[in-house]
């Protein structure tokens, strides 16, 4: 927000210079982005009057004038401005004057005619970019007065960044309140005298959306002169705030917006059919806006309508049909309180960002509308004339924001600030902020002012007290902290350790958005309902992720589109699953996921080009699981997942509970996502693995190990892992290692069966095993496999 320093000082005028004022505003939490003079550096320019104006005898576009600047004679000045005329009060640079850019005014002859000065435009004085003509001053401007003094050009434009919680500072009144509080000065508000109704004209107003519009004020003003010029003082204040003068009616509403922070709008009353209806738009309803563009409205957009059509987007932009124009004689002034939620995001949807929507999205003082209406009515009648009707007030008290009542405890205040502020000082600060304060024992009860809807909880009051007291006044004290050795459970497995392992295996960590495209997510998790955001950054980021796969697969596509075909990435982060049993109805699980695709190895002259397969990723995953000490308790089971290939995927179970999936992306999903080639993914619920099994030290056998190989024929649907587990269970005391080293299908093995070649490592810690014992254990394993899986030894 930009504003004039002199305008601010009309409300509150602390005895500090501009730099100190800017620093004070910054320290109050309203960061000053810049302080710029409102005009260039110049001197020797005074108010003058064009007494005579005649055509230059030797030039069609020049005029010869005689100008009174209050001296003992009239000055001859040649001027080329098209608006130069007799009787006009102007800004005159006299001989010896120096204009911006070190331009010195000297006596000269222009096309044979003497010129003893220059009639100046706004651009020539560095005031604005307007160079269409010379400055036209009011007829009562005192001749001979220094123009800097008359236009109050010894002023600065201050630009501040207003945080979303301080919407009350989007008007001069809000900044002035803060400056007054910080300097313990009274706030000098302009006198706003209610304008009595001189006519009975009204319009019927109906509010059909009270949740979106809690208060709507309307007032008819008849017989205005819309072509009346806006006073120079108002134009200058608007200009110094970065707003261009348009016409008197619009300038008045903009002035009130800047002064009080209350958006207003003026309708051409004669173009309103029937009356005003505040309602939600009909789906697909259209409205031609003031800038000539057509907006197609959604059913959640608030509109101001008459009995036949929409006239304006409520709190955002007016419509062309009902806008004020050169023929307007009667207007309806609108001043309303729209709830922030009913405005937020609607302007952005149509590519708009207006001063009104900026304020309504952040919140407007719900007690301000009557004051703003009276201020606008008074200014409008003073400038344009006319007669005002009564104020029409439609208010729904039930939906108006209520002022918060907050209890501030002394213990909380001292603990958060780390410094004791006297009771009477705390009370004084809260009252100067506009709170209604009741003192209690070691506490204060404060009712927040209507304009401070960001005051809701105790911490808000602590922040306000510290801010006004001054952060610089809180003494620095070293933090007293004893050095206590932290405890560490050996069973805690750091996620950082797992990340290091994956890095060592060639993976790179990525971080993707928690917001994802709901359409893509639905492809990966069909039929699963996700949490949708009410105000998303974009449609493609409007759902909370159900897994990390959505972001990881998008990252793979992004890399493949840039000729990076060998990708190994992983991510850890939260997923958000709807769960009625969880707080707020959403369960947040910490997940670890990874993706690989492309060649198994980097390109090398001595390595074959082989594409990664299921077992590459499963091997990496087993390395991660091995860190947890739970690998022996993990099972990989064939289980359907709509995102994975049915024949090249597995569910991961730990002690009978599913903790994740691993597999090749389903070919259909691969096609829809534009993935280039086979892509493999895994995902684990990390919280179920973080508590690792601490390895127990065991005696290392000094006796020789014995290997025996067996080949068993089993049905095709028998998982090899079950065969290995059964061998371990049967030979628990002597079998120290079981490994699958070959799978065979073909000649000698019936169709629907497979041959598994297994090595058994047998060893004892106390003695050398005899051949009979070894043979007995192997036979025991074979018998167990035969009983459970109908396995037979292969010939």
From Swiss-Prot:
EC number: 6.1.1.20
FDX-ACB domain sequence ranges: 701-794
Residues the entry annotates as binding Mg(2+): 454, 460, 463-464
Keyword Metal-binding part of the UniProt annotation: yes
Main location (coarse class): cytoplasm
Subcellular location field: Cytoplasm
Top-level class of the enzyme under EC nomenclature: ligase
Domain tRNA-binding as annotated: residue spans: 39-148
GO cellular component entries: phenylalanine-tRNA ligase complex
Source domain of life: Bacteria
Coiled coil: none
Required co-factors: Mg(2+)
GO biological process, one term: phenylalanyl-tRNA aminoacylation
Record's keyword annotation contains Aminoacyl-tRNA synthetase: yes
Gene3D superfamilies: 3.30.56.10, Bira Bifunctional Protein, Domain 2, Ferrodoxin-fold anticodon-binding domain, Nucleic acid-binding proteins, Phenylalanyl-trna Synthetase, Chain B, domain 3
NCBIfam families in the cross-refs: pheT_bact (TIGR00472), YtpR (NF045760)
Protein name: Phenylalanine--tRNA ligase beta subunit
Lineage: Bacteria, Pseudomonadati, Pseudomonadota, Gammaproteobacteria, Enterobacterales
This protein's encoding gene: pheT
